[in-house]
């Protein structure tokens, strides 16, 4: 795992959300201290913190900080303030379900403690936010173990966007088996799509993997077919921002194209995600809201000067949906789901509920 990367955490005093500003990597590693809902909202919206699990963690911690200073004297007034902050943070980005899952979990915690004094409710909210982070770290490693069971030493792996330590609490999702394999001498060869237009693969994945000593080769998105045709790719691993009940999966724009290429070349295509990213209330990928972002991200953001004609129309969706029938398996902390996903995903949640009852 990359050394000294802690993308999202509360400080020891519980007075600030500390994030690494991912818009500056790989040229600079700068930590930001966020203390207000407005700062947390901006960090999520601007991708200073990104990756579905990390967004959920940041939202939970930002919600706690948003009500920590409340002077409400009774529960109803405190709950009113809480709901306002929750709704505001929920508006930061529409696609990653972890954002809404984490905020809903914080509200459930508050309601469980509604008969407690306000200071005790605040402490319970802090503990819940910390628990979300700790659980994600454990899930990362377990996902990595399940995914590693599908691989052999020396394999070539292609990944898209960034689903590593920067996107989660620990090892990541799609990169977790790569890190575990590196620790055990598997010596994987990794191809990282640059992931236009925001270059998460070039800026973040290549950076992470190099920090960990992994053999990584950066490629342009339109080179994926070439490396697959050359026989250099044995498996594709990606993370995701939302899985629908039928297995359709929303992930960074370009993922669907990679899945189609993998199907053509007979390469298994795996999605790695914690169960918090699976939304059984969402029937299919058609029901997932796809975020659209600023045209400038395509035309000029990473260039010394503008690289497209002034006034040209730009379509800039942040995500696309990979159809379930293109996905070989969905790997979670409760096991590996295979088609038909309408059944296997429900089975994962049955296992999860059983594990929670035993805990």
Swiss-Prot record:
Stretches of the chain forming a coiled coil according to its record: none
Any one Gene Ontology BP term: L-methionine salvage from methylthioadenosine
GO molecular function: S-methyl-5-thioribose-1-phosphate isomerase activity
Statement: the UniProt record of this protein carries the keyword Iron: no
Catalytic residue positions: 241 (proton donor)
Biochemical pathway: Amino-acid biosynthesis; L-methionine biosynthesis via salvage pathway; L-methionine from S-methyl-5-thio-alpha-D-ribose 1-phosphate: step 1/6
InterPro entries linked: IF-2B-related, IF-M1Pi, IF_2B-like_C, Initiation_fac_2B_a/b/d, M1Pi_N, NagB/RpiA_transferase-like
Site (Transition state stabilizer): 161
Reactions mediated catalytically: 5-(methylsulfanyl)-alpha-D-ribose 1-phosphate = 5-(methylsulfanyl)-D-ribulose 1-phosphate
Disulfide cross-links: none
The keyword DNA damage appears for this protein: no
Record: residues binding substrate: 50-52, 93, 200, 251-252
UniProt keyword annotations, A-Z: Amino-acid biosynthesis, Isomerase, Methionine biosynthesis
EC number, as in UniProt: 5.3.1.23
Function of the protein: Catalyzes the interconversion of methylthioribose-1-phosphate (MTR-1-P) into methylthioribulose-1-phosphate (MTRu-1-P).
Similarity comment: family membership: Belongs to the eIF-2B alpha/beta/delta subunits family. MtnA subfamily.
Record-given protein name: Methylthioribose-1-phosphate isomerase
Organism of origin: Symbiobacterium thermophilum (strain DSM 24528 / JCM 14929 / IAM 14863 / T)
């Amino acid at each position: 795992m990359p050394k000294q990367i802690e993308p999202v955490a509360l400080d020891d005093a519980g007075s600030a959300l500390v994030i690494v500003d991912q818009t500056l990597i790989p040229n600079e590693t700068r930590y930001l201290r966020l203390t207000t809902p407005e700062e947390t909202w901006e960090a999520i919206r601007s991708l200073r913190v990104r990756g579905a699990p990390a967004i959920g963690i940041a939202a939970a911690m930002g919600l706690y900080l948003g009500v920590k200073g409340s002077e409400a004297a009774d529960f109803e007034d405190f709950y009113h303030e809480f709901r306002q902050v929750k709704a505001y943070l929920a508006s930061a980005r529409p696609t990653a379900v972890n954002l809404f899952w984490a905020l809903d979990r914080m509200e459930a915690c508050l309601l469980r403690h509604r008969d407690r004094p306000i200071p005790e409710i605040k402490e319970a909210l802090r503990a819940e936010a910390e628990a979300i982070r700790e659980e994600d770290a454990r899930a990362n490693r377990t996902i990595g173990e399940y995914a590693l069971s599908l691989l052999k030493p020396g394999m070539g792996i292609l990944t898209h966007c960034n689903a590593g330590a920067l996107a989660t609490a620990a090892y990541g999702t799609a990169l977790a088996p790569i890190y575990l394999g590196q620790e055990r001498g598997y010596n994987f060869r990794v191809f990282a799509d640059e992931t236009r237009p925001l270059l998460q693969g070039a800026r973040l994945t290549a950076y992470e993997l190099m920090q960990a000593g992994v053999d990584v080769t950066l490629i342009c998105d339109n080179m994926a077919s070439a490396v697959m045709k050359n026989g250099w790719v044995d498996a594709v691993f990606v993370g995701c921002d939302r899985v629908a009940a039928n297995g359709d999966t929303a992930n960074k724009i370009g993922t669907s194209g990679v899945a189609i290429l993998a199907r053509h070349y007979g390469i298994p295509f795996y999605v790695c995600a914690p169960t918090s990213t699976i939304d059984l209330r969402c029937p299919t990928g058609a029901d997932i809201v796809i975020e659209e972002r600023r045209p400038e991200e395509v035309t000029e953001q990473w260039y010394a000067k503008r690289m497209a004609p002034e006034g040209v129309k730009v379509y800039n969706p942040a995500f696309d949906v990979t159809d379930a029938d293109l996905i070989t398996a969905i790997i979670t902390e409760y096991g590996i789901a295979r088609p038909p996903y309408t059944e296997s995903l429900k089975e994962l949640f049955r296992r999860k509920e059983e594990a929670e009852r035993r805990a």
